Amino acid sequence: MSQTGHDMWAEARNLMVDDQLRPSEISNPGILKAMRALPREECVQPAQRAAAYADVSLPLAPGRVLAQPLLTARLAQAANPLPGEHALVVGAATGYSAGVLARLGLVVSALECDEQLAAMGQAFCKANALAVQWSVGPLNTGLPANGPYDLIYFDGCVGAVPDFCQKQLKPGGRLVGLIQKTGDIPEIFRATLTATQEGARYAFAYLSKAQSPLLPGLCPQPQFSL
């Protein structure tokens, strides 16, 4: 008896979790459950679906990718997400990471600058993760209307922490994403906003090296010297 399409994708999701995530110290049961359930193949073009669960990133638009499954899981686990928290996903693309956070019980605002990617993401979340509210606009200003947030999640790489984060993050809130200092390999980071006598500051933790393109508008500014 041949497999149905539903069975085929369900098996692919289970293999992804069991062969890629669990051996790589992804232990949060909510993340594993969400990624066993969410149809990642709906976040890419039909011609890419056969590779949707492979250990690779997949191009979505110039300079934009659907992150490899393990990177998404590592970022979500680094975020220490809690049900009921409010999260902003910056560079939400076609909605997969936003969907994972929503399946973990977070109330998610998804911000995307590319209208076509956002349309795919909205359709994906409407079918699979209703607790996601979408907005289209520049990434470098955040989304103050829905803040402040417990978590700001960059679904990609930044050159530095954007200025908007301190105003839109709650005290004790977290930033998660990849950061690439000039000339360095990107690193997964978590930054917690803490209060000090000198004012609010971030406490940084750098977790592991990874690869992801710089998000539009969040690249480091070029430095010129005479």
Tell where the protein language model's regions lie, with residue ranges:
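Class I SAM-dependent transferase core
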Residues: 1-90, 96-100, 104, 117-126, ...
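Conserved nucleotide-cofactor-binding alpha/beta core module
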Residues: 80-206
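Catalytic, metal-anchored helix/loop core of enzyme active sites in primary metabolism
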Residues: 226
